[in-house]
């Protein structure tokens, strides 16, 4: 997936409620945003962050993916 994912698409899909699964050497976790929650938040590495941090988190994901440190895939609804 890394070849067809860009920063803007990553931010857009997270804001739209899609879940991104990140696989590392030590396991996997999901990233998602809840822009309409109170307070609006993004969930990353098992922690809740203010939605204002979404751009920085998305950039970090892209950087780590391009360095080959993580693999990503969108979680599909069954």
Tell where the protein language model's regions lie, with residue ranges.
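N-terminal acidic leader/helix
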Residues: 3-29
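Surface-exposed polar/charged interaction patches
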Residues: 13-20, 60, 64-71
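Acidic, low-complexity, intrinsically disordered interaction modules
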Residues: 23-66
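Short acidic DE-rich linear segments
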Residues: 75-78
């Amino acid at each position: 997936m890394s070849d067809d994912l860009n920063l803007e698409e990553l931010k857009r899909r997270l804001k739209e409620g899609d879940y991104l699964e990140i696989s590392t050497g030590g396991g996997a976790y999901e990233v998602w945003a809840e822009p309409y929650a109170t307070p609006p938040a993004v969930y990353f590495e098992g922690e809740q962050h203010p939605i204002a941090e979404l751009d920085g988190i998305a950039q970090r994901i892209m950087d780590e993916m391009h360095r080959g440190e993580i693999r990503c895939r969108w979680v599909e609804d069954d």
